[in-house]
From Swiss-Prot:
This is Cyclic GMP-AMP synthase-like receptor 1. The lineage of its organism: Eukaryota, Metazoa, Ecdysozoa, Arthropoda, Hexapoda. It comes from Drosophila melanogaster (Fruit fly). Keywords: Antiviral defense, ATP-binding, GTP-binding, Immunity, Innate immunity, Magnesium, Manganese, Metal-binding, Nucleotide-binding, Nucleotidyltransferase, RNA-binding, Transferase. Changing residue 23 to E: Abolished ability to activate Sting. Belongs to the mab-21 family. Its EC number is 2.7.7.-. Nucleotidyltransferase that catalyzes the formation of cyclic GMP-AMP (3',2'-cGAMP) from ATP and GTP and plays a key role in antiviral innate immunity. Synthesizes 3',2'-cGAMP in a two-step reaction through production of the linear intermediate pppA(2'-5')pG. Acts as a key sensor of double-stranded RNA (dsRNA), the presence of dsRNA in the cytoplasm being a danger signal that triggers the immune responses.
Amino acid sequence: MAMNLENIVNQATAQYVKIKEHREPYTAHYNALKDKVYSEWKSSAVLGKLLKGSTLCGGYGDKLKVSIPDEFDLLIHLVFPENDKIIVKADASKPGNVILDMTKVMEIIGSQEHNKPVFDRLQKIVNNKKQLLEDKLNSFLESIMTQTLNKMGNQIEVAGRISHLQYKKCGPAHTIFVKGSCKYSVDFVPAIRLSAAQVVLAPEQRIHFGETLYWDAIPKPMKPAKTDNTSFTSSFYEAERRLLYGKQFLKPAIRLMKQNRNVKNKANLKSYHIKTLFLWQVIQQDPSYWSNSPKDIFIEMLGKLADSLALTPKKGKLPFFWDPKLDMFAQLTDSQRTDLYNHFRKCEYTFRKDNGNVNDCTENNVHSSFSKNTTYKL
C-alpha cells in the first residue's frame, strides 16, 4: 500500500490513540469502586434522599478518551424534594453561571416530616435570601466523602486484590485516587439536576438545547475561593452529547487533537476547550463536513484553534457554547496563549506541508505528534 499522510495518521491512531487492551480491567475496577461509594452515600440520611443516579461523562463518557483509561469523570445527580420549584436565575456577574433560589422549595418541605432532614440541611447551606451556597454544599459533601472512605478503611478489594484510596477535593470534583493493580482517579462531580423548563439560556442557545430533558448546575468553587458563593456553573452534558452524536469522523479528529495535546504537555488547553471548539463547528458546518477524513478535519481544526488563541493582529477567543459572553481563554496569560498558539500553528503548518508532499520525514513527523517515544521534535 502506497504511503500517504492519511495512511500514516491512521497507523499512528491505531498505535497510540486507540489502546483497548487495558480498558476491561480498569472499567471493572472503576465500576466496583463507583458502586461501593454510591452505596455508602445512599445510606446517608440527607444525601441518600437527594441521589438520583449518575452519568459517566468526560473523555470516557463521550468516547473521546485516548490511551489508558486512567481518569473517570462521574456526574452525581442531586435532586431536591420539590426540585422543580427551584427558581433559576442567570448570574449577571458571571456569564455561564446561575443562582439557585430555594425559597419555594423550603416553604413547601418545611412542614413535611419526611423531608425534615433535607430541610434542616438546607437551612445550613443557603443564605438569608434562601440562595444555595456552593461552598457550604461542597463542605457538606466533603464531610460525607471523608466519612465514606473512613468506613472503607481507605481501601477497596476487587478480584481479591487490595487497592489503596486517597481523597482530595479538586475544583468541583471530589476525587478518589486509586493505587493498586490499576492506578487511576475518579472525579465524583456533584450536579444539581434541573429540567428543561428551568433553562435560562438565550433564544439562540435554547435552540441548540433542543429536546433535551435535563441540564445541571455544578457547585464549582470560584478562583480564588469565595465564601458564601451563590454562583453555580451551568453544565449541558446531555445536550452536548446529542449535538456530537452521529457526526462520522468528528470524534476521531477530537481524539487526535487530545493525543497531540497530551504528548506535547500542553495542559493549559483543557479537554472542554477542544470540545467547545468542535461544538461551534457542529452548528457552523454542513453535516456532510464530518464525512471528511479525521486527518483533514484535524488539520482544519488545528488552524481554527490557533486562530482562537492568537493575540495579534486581532485577539482571538473561544466563546462558551452556551453563553458566548464568556471567553473560555480569558483566564490564560499572554505567555500561555502564545505557547499554545505557537505549538498548534506549527503543528498545522507541518501537517499541511506533509499533506501535499509526503517525504522521508513525514512518518516521523506524524508519529512524534502522537507519541513521546520518537526522536523527531515538531
